Amino acid sequence: MIVEMTGIHKSFSGNPVLKDVSFTLEKGEIHALMGENGAGKSTLMKILTGIYERDSGTVKIKGREVHYKHPKEAEADGLAVIHQELNILPELTVAENLFVGKERTYGKTGWIKSKEMNRLAEEKLAELGLKVKGTERAGNLSVGKQQLIEIAKALMTNADIIIMDEPTAALTDREIDTLFATVRELQKKGVTFVYISHRMEEIFSLCQRITVLRDGEYVGTKVIAETSFDEIVKMMVGRALGNRFPEHTLTPGDVKLEIKHLTRAGEFENVSLSVRAGEILGISGLMGAGRSELVETIFGYRKADSGEVWIDGKQAAIKGPDQAIAQGIGFVSEDRKSKGLIVDFSIRDNISLTNLSRISTSSWISSEKERSLYEELAKKLHVKASGPSQQAKSLSGGNQQKIVIAKWLGIEPKILILDEPTRGVDVGAKKEIYTIMNELAKQGVAIIMVSSELPEVIGLSTRVAVMFEGKLMHILERDELSEETIMHYATGGDKHVRQ
């Protein structure tokens, strides 16, 4: 065994997070680590890599017991981590991000070899399918491209044990395929991987073994070839989940929102589509197709160069999010940490921000109304929290996403836009979010959902609009939906539009 963790215990402020957990890695394997948000996966890996110190238990790396007090010590032993949360320095260039702390210099002079770093950065990212200049400012790139920089950074350390924590959350299917090909090539060279993900399809495609944690405890380890989706879900949640997606019984009504010939130069062009009350319109496409840019423009985050937005049969002038909200539009961003939540604020304060008119009397916030709103929405969305004062950053990914959705449900939207609504969310919380979306649609809310997960798009959508390089290629009816058909149009096939 290249890694042996035995009897690991860890508590924070007296609250046990890991209780007698054991975990092993065989050299050259890709080992999945699964569990619901809050199960202890990331904490266990942070102990392995020296970010946290264990309270008790043993950790052996390559047969030697270790007591890392700093991540640099783990890195020196050949461990690298691709974190779920981006660690990009937005003001630095792509190359500077890849080489931060490891800059190439001219001997004793200390002068940085910028051209060499730019070239190496471009070569490494090209291996992952990303064509970008090393001199490009990292903050200008999309979340998905920033994720590829994080992955390249870890791969450049020449580590022989790599921990990947939700590495594909912001990637398209094509980028995932390229990443997996790279991982398999490294595996052939003896590199060992821990793969943390909530995406069952990826785990069953890539990994050889899987370990499941639940509530900070070790549940078991299975050989992938000898287990099933249902068995792993039951290990994770302690019960069978039943059908993955809600039964599709939606009956769309009148057109709620329509966009006509909407254009934003360099991002999307001449897009026309509509969404009806009581339907879920999926928007699919590869990275760079313009999906997020389109919905952000509808919501007023971005300014359209031309085109029109119509709501309830009337042309709407939306020049900012405040005007979109006034028109009854809610927006769940793909990046909940920077655009969806103020993570240092409490749950109560995050929910209150979009609902001030509902909880205020004569410009004064009513604590009673504020608490009542929290209790109503927390109950409706099954939020697991100690109370309204708990900081958003201390919640699991699934509960953070529920808070983002909750703050928009408070405004009782007519139209709800969700951009990657289940990114970084565990299988149990995903099902709860799917149920919430379906119930909202049944109540007459018009829902637009952008998602990179094709099973999610197919499982939830009434219709699917497919984009390619900023153009709307086709709108598929529910009975036309399949992964093959969506990918056909997402890669540029049959350049025509039908609504």
Swiss-Prot record:
Membrane topology: Peripheral membrane protein
Enzyme class: translocase
Record has Repeat as a keyword: yes
Keyword terms, alphabetized: ATP-binding, Cell membrane, Membrane, Nucleotide-binding, Repeat, Sugar transport, Translocase, Transport
InterPro entries: AAA+_ATPase, ABC_carbohydrate_import_ATPase, ABC_transporter-like_ATP-bd, ABC_transporter-like_CS, P-loop_NTPase
Catalytic activity: D-ribose(out) + ATP + H2O = D-ribose(in) + ADP + phosphate + H(+)
SMART domains registered for this protein in UniProt: AAA (SM00382)
Enzyme Commission number(s) from the entry: 7.5.2.7
Domain of life where this protein originates: Bacteria
GO molecular function terms noted in the UniProt entry: ABC-type D-ribose transporter activity; ATP binding; ATP hydrolysis activity
Subunit and partners: The complex is composed of an ATP-binding protein (RbsA), two transmembrane proteins (RbsC) and a solute-binding protein (RbsB).
Protein family according to the UniProt entry: Belongs to the ABC transporter superfamily. Ribose importer (TC 3.A.1.2.1) family.
Name of the featured protein: Ribose import ATP-binding protein RbsA
Recorded name of the encoding gene: rbsA
